[in-house]
A protein has these predicted regions:
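Conserved donor NDP-sugar-binding/catalytic core segment of glycosyltransferases
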Residues: 397-429, 493, 505
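Short, flexible, basic/aromatic active-site loop/helix in glycosyltransferases
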Residues: 417-418, 432-450, 465
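Short, acidic, metal-binding catalytic loop of nucleotide-sugar glycosyltransferases
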Residues: 326-335
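Active-site mouth of glycoside hydrolases
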Residues: 16-17, 23-182
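Aromatic-rich peripheral "rim/lid" segments of glycoside hydrolase catalytic domains that contact
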Residues: 252-303
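Short aromatic/hydrophobic "clamp" motif used to bind/position activated sugar donors
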Residues: 385
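A conserved acidic beta->alpha catalytic loop
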Residues: 327, 342-350, 392
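Extracellular glycoside hydrolase catalytic/binding regions
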Residues: 139, 144-244, 271-273
């Protein structure tokens, strides 16, 4: 039998991802997984295959997670029993794997060999390309570089098996390390307070975006808490995982018998099975929790749930209406109605609605979206109005998650969830889906929103009436923004749940997309006089919360904490405005045109225009690179087309907004935004002069002991409050030395500690020197207009700057702190 002649399997369809769920065939799958191994040598001579029947039947699991590469026979047995297998790639990720490249080559080879062995196997669920890369090591290597390598590993895997699923098993200390191309978000979470666990799951759901969330590890030590408490905690863990809408959970572990790095672990008892093979009470408890679960919404209690009125307003939307109404007639909610407001009394819409006995049609003259929504509310019978669009498709449990929010908080004004675009059917559609400006929620916390798009927004009847419904001046867009702001001003909150998602088609052509963005620009101009305090100068709306987009993590600030040990290292995303927004604004293009015209009088104008254009397309290219394009349609052409859409979107939307709303724009505030963004860029800049050294210890001495020794030797040293580095050593009036360290843990008590000294100019110097340099760069093109020997002046400035930089480097190397002497005093040996 070849490795492709797989035996008969009780698993009929492979595991796939669709939205925030796992699917097998046309059925949603809630993953009920348990970790399996690695076992001490000789614990299970048959790889533990005799345990698989117990895992499937006694525990009720449908998947296992492994940390070693199994044999093909092992996967055959899993397929026969009905257990899917997640394989964690075991490679040397505990060291600086970016330095030599050997570890990455090892990982590539192992991944390709493993995929070649198991490609197409019915039991294969997916691969974890790495697991919990240590936080200070990630900081040392650089989070962007590490993320790029994880993404590269995933691409290597996909190139060899396009149908397999890939992810990185993350943990809270590197929360920011999220590969943009992974198929689902995975997190190992060990939070032992129910409220903390539930709150963190909500956060992870928002980080997951349009992808499923899998709890890739959760466990409770029975030795610490007792066996009954372990069972109780695992019970609420399963419940909270489901209530968050996560796609599955993995419990650590099947048995107390396990090892790490060749060492048998005997200090913890996480297993369902004791070391002697007898079960703990947690086995029966978890089985009873898992048994009735086929999807996450099964745990939601709907007793006393409100009557819901689903309102669809359509204006000549027959092209997508059938798909929308088909989904609305099969919703799994006990008490709801569906109303279609036919704005404009389109005959084709009436014909479609007439084929559904349970749907009411309301014909009206063409009055616009806001007025149509008000008509729907007037005719509705429900306690809650649930709005969606004619190009949306609802999941069966959509209303369950909407109702859950109102049941949990009787004072909630509105509720909603994400809107996710269906898979693209063409290259251009894939690019438009990745383009900016689509309808998106704005969150001020993980469960509270500042804005909910009208395609997925529910509102209580009494709140709707109190704020006066939708403002009829908005005919096509902007109505939901105005409505949400008025609800907030009335003192109500907007709820949000990541599982309450709907599918929402984006525009199908570039022309339709750009027309939509023009409409959004018009709507923003209409919002300006109504909510002037919520807009910044010449730009768009100012949000207190974060606008969620499917863009891969890129910018933003990470708080690493004291010596990089913060247990929950959050990423604080940038606003997406600042200088990046400036170079895409229509006024930037006005300046480009002025510079081009000036070029006809002197060549320096064309130079300025060229630099401005380069800056614009550099920003657009960077944003296009971070945008998630469906991999089937990704490539060079896709990224450059997307960059063009980004430039066009910024120009058209800001142009229409300014053209329609210039009377209400606060020009002084716009100038303030630009200058503030430029000032922050200068103030946060680092001049790095890296000086690296590594130290070896066979006595368990690592970075903690070294940092303590350095702190003692330099009493004036300060802990870096941001955690970007460990210590800031103030050695010079004009400069600071910053120290960052990381320790690699090798076999036995061996440690390799890496140190990096970074020279950083003091704040005053940065505020003086950098603006001067920027000024020189700006003025340089115009020197021919001012001086006859301009080239001599420019050459002198450049030469002086180069000489100053070289002298500074030599001086600072001579003045660097004596780390070597301190390390040797601790018994650490320098490594060349």
């Amino acid at each position: 039998m070849t490795d492709r002649d797989f035996p008969v399997s009780s698993i009929e369809d492979p595991l796939r991802v669709l939205g925030k769920h796992f699917r097998s065939g046309d059925q949603s799958v809630f993953l009920k997984a348990v970790t399996f191994g690695p076992f001490p040598a000789g614990a299970f001579p048959d790889e533990g295959m005799a345990q698989l029947e117990r895992i499937r039947n006694e525990l009720g699991a449908n998947a296992i997670r492994m940390y070693e590469i199994p044999t093909l026979e092992f996967l055959h047995e899993c397929a026969r029993i009905g257990l899917r297998v997640f394989i964690t790639l075991p490679w040397s990720q505990h060291v600086d794997f970016l330095r030599g490249g050997g570890e990455l080559a090892e990982a590539d080879e192992l991944l390709i060999e493993t995929i070649e062995r198991f490609r197409g196997h019915p039991a294969l669920a997916g691969y974890f390309v790495a697991n919990e890369i240590e936080t200070t090591l990630v900081r040392w290597m650089g989070r962007r570089k590490v993320r790029e390598q994880l993404e590269r590993l995933i691409e290597v895997g996909r190139a060899n098996d396009p149908d397999a699923l890939f992810s990185y098993a993350n943990y809270p200390s590197t929360e920011y390390l999220i590969p943009g191309n992974q198929d689902f978000l995975s997190f190992n979470i060990y939070l032992e307070q129910r409220e903390d666990f539930a709150a963190y799951l909500n956060r992870l759901q928002n980080l997951a975006g349009n992808k499923p969330l899998l709890v890739s590890e959760f466990g409770v030590d029975a030795r610490t808490h007792g066996e009954l408490t372990q069972a109780e905690m695992l019970e609420w863990q399963v419940e909270e995982t489901c209530l968050s809408g996560a796609a599955g959970t993995t419990i650590f572990s099947w048995t107390d018998l396990w090892q790490r790095g060749g060492q048998t672990i005997e200090d913890y008892d996480f297993g369902f099975m004791r070391r002697d093979g007898t079960p703990r009470p947690s086995l029966d408890v978890v089985r009873e929790c898992w048994e009735p679960l086929s999807r996450t919404s099964d745990v939601v209690e709907l007793a006393g749930g409100p009557k819901l009125s689903v309102i669809v307003c359509t204006y000549k939307g027959s092209a997508t209406l059938v798909e929308c109404l088909d989904s609305l007639t099969t919703l799994d909610y006990p008490d709801y109605e569906v109303l279609v407001v036919n704005d404009g009394s389109d005959d084709r819409v009436s014909e479609i609605v007439a084929t559904y006995d349970s749907i009411r049609e309301i014909k009206i003259d063409h009055v616009g979206l806001s007025a149509a929504r008000n008509v729907g509310a007037k005719e509705a019978k429900g306690e809650v109005f649930v709005y969606t669009d004619d190009d949306c498709i609802a999941e069966a449990d959509w209303l369950t998650w909407i109702a859950k929010q109102f049941l949990e908080d009787p004072e909630l004004g509105c509720a909603g969830g994400p809107n996710i675009p269906p898979a693209p059917e063409s290259e251009m559609q894939a690019r438009i889906i990745a383009a900016p400006g689509g309808p998106s929620h704005v969150l001020i916390s993980d469960t509270r929103a500042e804005h909910l798009p009208g395609c997925n927004m529910a509102v209580r009847r009494e709140v709707f009436e109190e704020v006066g419904g939708f403002n009829p001046i908005f005919w096509a867009a902007g109505d939901d923004v105005d409505f949400c702001w008025r609800v907030l001003e009335a003192g109500y909150e907007l709820g949000f749940h990541a599982a309450a998602f709907i599918w929402h088609h984006r525009r199908f052509t570039p022309r339709a997309y750009l027309k939509q963005q023009i409409g959004y620009g018009k709507a923003e101009a209409m919002l300006l006089p109504l909510h002037s305090k919520r807009f910044r100068g010449l730009g768009g709306a100012v949000w207190s919360g974060h606008v969620y987009t499917p863009q891969a993590p890129g910018g933003g600030f990470v708080y690493h904490g004291h010596f990089g040990y913060e247990p929950f290292q959050l990423i604080y995303p940038d606003s997406g405005s600042g200088l990046g927004g400036v170079v895409l604004h229509v006024l930037w293009w006005v300046c480009v045109v002025i510079a081009v015209v000036g070029g006809f009088f002197h060549w320096s104008g064309w130079l300025v225009a060229g630099l401005m254009l380069y800056t614009t397309f550099r920003v657009a290219r960077k944003r296009a690179k971070r945008a998630p394009v469906e991999r089937e349609y990704d490539g060079f052409a896709a990224r450059w087309t997307l960059a063009g859409l980004i430039v066009a979107q910024g120009f058209l939307r800001s142009g229409v907004r300014l053209l329609r709303g210039w009377k209400y724009a606060k020009w002084s505030r716009g100038l303030e935004v630009v200058t503030t963004a430029a000032w922050k860029k200068v103030a946060s800049g680092w001049w790095k002069l890296g000086y690296e050294k590594a130290f070896w210890s066979e006595n368990g001495i690592g970075r903690d002991e070294l940092l303590a020794g350095i702190s003692a030797a330099y009493p004036e040293a300060q802990v870096d409050a941001s955690g970007r580095t460990d210590l800031i050593l103030k050695r010079c009036l004009l400069w600071n030395w910053a120290l960052v360290t990381a320790t690699e843990y090798h076999a036995d008590n061996n440690r390799l500690t890496r140190t990096r000294l970074l020279a950083r100019p003091r704040f005053l110097i940065r505020m003086i020197v950098l603006p001067v340099l920027l000024g020189v760069l700006v003025v340089a093109p115009f020197t021919p207009l001012l001086f006859t020997d301009a080239w001599k002046i420019l050459l002198g400035v450049v030469s002086g700057y180069a000489a100053l930089t070289a002298a500074t480097r030599i001086f600072m190397k001579l003045r660097r702190p004596a780390i070597l002497r301190i390390a040797e005093g601790l018994g650490m040996d320098p490594v060349e």
